[in-house]
């Protein structure tokens, strides 16, 4: 709420939050005039520009000057998975949390760097493949509902560590 209050004060406009389960919902909200400002990753931002007339006007920069964020594969801290090679055994024994199809870090980047570059797909490798947003994937890993999932550094280190430290302590990259 603090961010919304600050934004309203700075712009002089009443700011109302809009919630959706995924990027597609936010993009459609923009398309129909329900959303005027949103935070997207690269892929969803491009879709918002194409489908909703959005404009890209800012980029995240950390206090240390680091630009953007990075895609991750995460597992429970007690998991025997410690490397990409462990994940790519593809023996259909594991459950996988895939990201929102409109997410750069949760779907697009892993689709290329993990799956395409290794001539694999999640469906060939895992017993079950579930699709969720970053928060859902983090909680699924922390609660051992999936064995490995996609995520990103911004969601894990900037959000989850602050909003749910117990879950954060149960996750490793």
Report residues per predicted region:
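Extracellular/periplasmic catalytic domains that process cell-envelope and extracellular macromolecules
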Residues: 31, 48-50, 65-68, 89-91, ...
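Bilobed "Venus flytrap"/periplasmic-binding protein-like clamshell domains
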Residues: 1-10, 20, 43, 64-139, ...
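Extracytoplasmic small-molecule ligand-binding "clamshell" domains
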Residues: 1-46
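Short beta-strand-centered segments that line the small-molecule binding cleft or hinge
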Residues: 37-38, 46-69
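Generic structural signal for residues in well-ordered beta-strands
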Residues: 15-17, 128, 171-173
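A ligand-binding cleft/hinge motif common to bilobed small-molecule-binding domains
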Residues: 41-53, 113-116, 140-143, 147-171
């Amino acid at each position: 709420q603090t961010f919304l209050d600050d934004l309203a004060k700075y712009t002089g406009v009443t700011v109302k939050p809009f919630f959706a389960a995924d990027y597609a919902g936010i993009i459609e909200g923009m398309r129909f005039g329900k959303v005027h400002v949103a935070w997207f990753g690269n892929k969803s931002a491009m879709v918002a520009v194409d489908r909703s007339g959005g404009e890209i006007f800012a980029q995240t920069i950390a206090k240390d000057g680091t630009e953007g964020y990075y895609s991750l594969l995460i597992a429970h801290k007690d998991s025997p998975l410690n490397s990409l090679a462990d994940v790519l055994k593809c023996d259909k024994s594991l459950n996988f949390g895939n990201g929102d199809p409109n997410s750069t870090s949760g779907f697009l980047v892993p689709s290329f760097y993990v799956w395409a570059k290794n001539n694999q797909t999640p469906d060939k490798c895992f017993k079950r493949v579930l699709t969720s947003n970053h928060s859902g994937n983090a909680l699924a890993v922390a609660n051992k509902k999936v064995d490995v999932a996609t995520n990103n550094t911004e969601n894990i280190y900037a959000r989850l560590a602050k909003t749910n430290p117990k879950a954060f302590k149960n996750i490793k990259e």
